[in-house]
Curated annotation (Swiss-Prot):
Cofactor(s), names only, from the UniProt record: Mn(2+)
Record-linked CDD domains: PEPCK_GTP
UniProt-annotated binding residues for GTP: A273, C274, G275, K276, T277, N278, R389, R420, F515, G516, D517, N518
Protein's UniProt name: Phosphoenolpyruvate carboxykinase [GTP]
Root EC class: lyase
Cytoplasm as UniProt keyword: yes
Organism: Corynebacterium glutamicum (strain R)
Annotated pathway: Carbohydrate biosynthesis; gluconeogenesis
InterPro entries on file: PEP_carboxykin_GTP_CS, PEP_carboxykinase_C, PEP_carboxykinase_GTP, PEP_carboxykinase_GTP_C, PEP_carboxykinase_GTP_N, PEP_carboxykinase_N
Record key words, sorted: Cytoplasm, Decarboxylase, Gluconeogenesis, GTP-binding, Lyase, Manganese, Metal-binding, Nucleotide-binding
Length: 610
């Protein structure tokens, strides 16, 4: 095939991969873009796009002295978060999508979306974005190509992935890649003026597990449009992982170094906006302990001879801005200091800096809010959207672990599960074994957050392994993959712990200070792994004793810590019915091991409650 078949191609195609060229040519006929551009991933390209988007009104260049090479985007108010009701797993059989996903027949969905895709890039440029998941040095990397009509997405992809010519070279003339289609769904007729944030009221985010394809339409926001993120790194990768014998998980990866210089690696799964990023970038409050970040959101876990190893498939942080400050997350703030950051839906100060709720200091007397309106401290609405974001490269972080770029990953010593529970769940508990830990993860529940556009904030929702919106196939089979991995790994598998930073007293106060003081919990986790401390036996497992936590210099009353470490049997009993119904909801493919572990939990609750 010749490149002439790609109508509107700018210059020569920098690849001889026939599958890729044919796919692009077909997409051009469907989308009908004005031009087709292969991105190279260079700084010059990023700068050029930024200039164009500033001119178009999509981006605002921030104060060069305060935020060098940084920009603010304001999305359409209808396009501010993941849209779970419009997210589909289009497996051939409905039961393979399972009860936690929206399903549609693949061909019917492709027919439906093709109607929307037809001509949807008129008047726009189609960008060809090759990208690599994880370090580009991986001898057998997972690759992808996204076709998009959004420059904002291209700029975000340069931060969030290893993208451009290097990734295209990795694909080579015959390499395979995940095909990702994305259009904001806002064609331009000749002479029609563009809007600052093109999008469409009709939205689809669809994954095709059998063919490893991702099709997205109508949204320019984050995880709906940056298809390497949740769509590939979790939904499609979880399918690949099941087929190939590994795990794709919604987990941070943290390197913790004790005063003697020994390093430990922890993976942790928390629902969105439950402190995952803050833990990934923790600054320990215990003298002599330091931490480094390998990843803040996603971990790919593979068995090697001596244990379970984790790689971060991403290249950047896409963090929730509100609440981030020099007290809660100094590393995130310092990561943004050199600039090179893309902000979305935060507020703009009069001197060209950014601001959000929970930032250090008092709110400025005047701001422009995320909708572009004047804002003062007397205003009724938030200046920044609750799900506003910063997007910045990991290697800019002062706490980036050098292993972040090691394709073999880091050996995981412990896995943490944790949500946002005001009661019931103690501060930290070690599970009995891998099977017990799998059941605990399967029944993880948390309060709702603003990261989903449709959540009722504050209600409790089940979130198995914090993967509920991201499991790309049947959730029962996903849990089976956990059991299978444990059977394969045996005693090489890491210990699993359940944590809860969010326990409250009767008057509503938090019983645990959280943030940097969570290092005290991590130290106990390591002490348990090393066999240095005992534990209380509670209904949920081996729960820490207050006297075994390093509480030196902590202002929190010891009574609060002790209360945070309780696992009241009557509260666990209140959850039994709900948990039983949830396991039933997950369906007949839930492993027998999970059911037997739940039966054992019920027996412990009954015995303690008697």
């Amino acid at each position: 095939m010749t490149t002439a078949a790609i109508r509107g191609l700018q210059g020569e195609a920098p690849t001889k991969n026939k599958e890729l060229l044919n796919w692009i040519a077909d997409a051009v006929e469907l989308f009908q873009p004005e031009a087709v551009v292969f991105v190279d991933g260079s700084q010059a390209e990023w700068d050029r796009m930024a200039e164009d988007l500033v001119e178009a009104g999509t981006l605002i260049k921030l104060n060069e002295e305060k935020r060098p090479n940084s920009y603010l985007a304001r999305s359409n108010p209808s396009d501010v978060a993941r849209v779970e009701s419009r997210t589909f797993i289009c497996s051939e059989k409905e039961e393979d999508a399972g009860p936690t996903n929206n399903w549609a027949p693949p061909q019917a969905m492709k027919d439906e979306m093709s109607k929307h895709y037809a001509g949807s890039m008129k008047g726009r440029t189609m960008y060809v974005v090759p990208f690599c998941m994880g370090p580009i040095s991986d001898p057998d990397p997972k690759l992808g190509v996204q076709l998009t009509d959004s420059e904002y997405v291209v700029m975000s992809m340069r931060i969030m992935t290893r993208m451009g010519i290097e990734a295209l070279d990795k694909i080579g003339a015959n390499g395979s890649f995940v095909k990702c289609l994305h259009s904001v769904g806002a064609p331009l007729e000749p002479g029609q003026e563009d809007v600052a944030w093109p999008c469409n009221d009709t939205k689809y985010i669809t994954q095709f597990p059998e063919t490893k394809e991702i099709w997205s339409y109508g949204s320019g926001y984050g995880g709906n449009a940056i298809l390497a993120k949740k769509c590939y790194a979790l939904r499609i990768a979880s399918v690949m992982a099941r087929e190939e014998g590994w795990m794709a998980e919604h987990m941070l990866i943290l390197k913790l170094i004790n005063p003697e210089g020994k390093a430990y690696h922890i993976a942790a799964a928390f629902p969105s906006a439950c402190g995952k990023t803050n833990l990934a970038m923790i600054t320990p409050t215990i003298p002599g302990w330091t931490a480094q970040v390998v990843g803040d959101d996603i971990a790919w876990l593979k068995l090697r001879e001596d244990g379970l190893y984790a790689v971060n498939p991403e290249n950047g942080f896409f963090g929730v801005a509100p609440g981030t400050n020099y007290a809660s997350n100094p590393i995130a703030m310092k990561t943004m200091e050199p600039g090179n950051t893309l902000f979305t839906n935060v507020a703009l100060t009069d001197d060209g800096d950014i601001w959000w709720e929970g930032m250090d200091g008092d709110a400025p007397a005047h701001l422009i809010d995320w909708k572009g309106n004047d804002w003062t401290p007397e205003s009724d609405e938030n200046a920044a959207h609750p799900n506003s974001r910063y997007c910045v490269a990991i290697d800019q972080s002062p706490a980036a672990a050098p292993e972040f770029n090691d394709w073999e990953g880091v050996k995981i010593d412990a896995i943490l599960f944790g949500g946002r529970r005001a009661d019931t769940v103690p501060l930290v508990t070690q599970t009995y074994d891998w099977e017990h830990g799998t059941m605990v993860g399967a029944l993880l529940a948390s309060g709702q957050t603003a990261a989903s556009a449709e959540a009722k904030v504050g209600t409790l929702r089940h979130d198995p392994m914090a993967m509920l919106p991201f499991i790309g196939y049947n959730a029962g089979e996903y849990l089976q993959n956990w059991i299978d991995m444990g059977n394969k790994g045996g005693d090489k598998m890491p210990s699993i712990f359940l944590v809860n930073w969010f326990r409250r007293g009767e008057d509503g106060r938090f019983l645990w200070p959280g943030f940097g003081d969570n290092s005290r919990v991590l130290k106990w986790v390591i002490d348990r792994i090393e066999g240095r401390v005992g534990a209380d036996e509670t209904v949920v497992g081996h729960t820490a004793k207050a006297e075994d936590l390093d509480l030196d210099g902590l202002d929190t009353p010891i009574e609060d810590v002790k209360e945070a470490l309780t696992a009241p049997a009557e509260q666990w009993a209140n959850d039994v019915q709900d948990n039983a119904e949830y396991l039933t909801f997950l369906g007949p493919r839930v492993p027998a091991e999970v059911h037997s572990q739940f039966d054992a939990l019920k027996a412990r609750i009954s015995a303690a409650h008697a």
